[in-house]
A protein has these predicted regions:
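Short gly/ser/thr-rich secondary-structure transition/capping motifs
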Residues: 24-26, 105-108, 132-133
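Conserved donor-binding/catalytic core segment of Leloir-type glycosyltransferases
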Residues: 11-15, 27-52, 58-63, 79
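Nucleotide-sugar-dependent glycosyltransferase donor-binding/catalytic pocket residues
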Residues: 47-53, 62-65, 69, 83-86, ...
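Nucleotide-sugar-dependent
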Residues: 52, 110-117, 122-145
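Nucleotide-activated donor-binding/catalytic signature segment of Leloir-type glycosyltransferases, i.e.
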Residues: 68-82, 87-116
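Helix-loop-beta element that forms the nucleotide-linked donor phosphate-binding surface
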Residues: 1-18
Length: 145
């Protein structure tokens, strides 16, 4: 199932079937192009455990929302993937924010969908904290190979 079907309020397009929240069909040549006013896409993958402090990203999103009120920044769609013990806690915390410029979705992505999502992102955020201070998160190392 497509993410736009699971999250139509965030990722859905126009009623014409020729656009999404991010793209539209160029009427002149039929090519697909990015919408000028599309939201930016931020992607992060987390295991929702204490060694990946989502609180840092949550604080950054709150600040971004505040800045959107005083300067022309794009709306933001945050795609935060993963499963783990603190996921529902943060889902409730996000829901309570009632952000106007930020929408957060928390899908589970199949392995074949993950590189497609990363390729669509404007920004990727890694929340992993290294115990040694010098290693890369395993997912980054896997995708680099």
């Amino acid at each position: 199932m497509k993410l736009s079907e699971i999250y139509p309020e965030v990722l859905g397009g126009g009623d014409d079937g020729h656009s999404t929240a991010f793209t539209e069909v160029n009427e002149e040549d039929g090519s697909i192009r990015l919408k000028a006013d599309r939201p930016a896409i931020l992607v992060s993958s987390t295991s929702w455990t204490p060694d990946e402090d989502f609180g840092i990203l949550f604080e950054a999103l709150s600040r971004y929302e505040s800045h959107c009120e005083i300067m022309p920044l794009p709306n933001l769609v945050c795609v935060i993937t993963g499963r783990g013990p603190r996921k529902e806690y943060y889902r409730e915390l996000i829901t309570d924010q009632h952000w106007q410029h930020i929408q957060v979705i928390m899908p589970w992505l199949e392995p074949q969908d993950y590189p497609l999502m990363l390729g669509s992102a404007d920004l990727g955020v890694c929340l992993h904290t290294s115990s040694s201070g010098v290693d890369l998160p395993m997912k980054v190392r896997i995708w680099m190979n």
